[in-house]
Amino acid sequence: MAKSFPVFSLLSFILIHLVLSSVSGPRHWWPPRGIIKVKCPYEKVNLSWYNGTVNPCPGLYQPICGTNFITYDNPCILCVESLKSHGRIRFYHDGKC
């Protein structure tokens, strides 16, 4: 019994992993490869209570073109502009315009 426990544990772990990965679907890693699908938040977050400096967009350089034909340094900056324009500016395509 003592020798079969590690084998049983390993098989159980593999089975659970396979079931969970098939149920939860594929994982999406950042940065994505190929076509970038940008999903921006629909409303601003009130951070007036925060006294520090807020940098919502890190220094990632991944050029992206907006529907206004302006190139943004990364999807985060495009999302900020989308919020400012009340959704009129959206993702158009990967890369520079």
From Swiss-Prot:
Gene3D superfamilies: 3.30.60.30. It comes from Homo sapiens. GO terms for molecular function: serine-type endopeptidase inhibitor activity. May be a serine protease inhibitor. Pfam families: Kazal_1. Glycans are attached at N51. The keyword DNA damage does not apply. The keyword Membrane does not apply. Residues 1-21 form the signal peptide. Keywords: Disulfide bond, Glycoprotein, Protease inhibitor, Secreted, Serine protease inhibitor, Signal. It is found in: Secreted. The record marks G59, L60 as: Reactive bond. Residues 34-97 form the Kazal-like domain. GO terms for cellular component: extracellular region. InterPro entries: Kazal-type_SerProtInhib (IPR050159), Kazal_dom (IPR002350), Kazal_dom_sf (IPR036058). This is Serine protease inhibitor Kazal-type 14. SMART domains: KAZAL. Disulfide bonds join C40-C79, C57-C76, C65-C97. The gene is SPINK14.
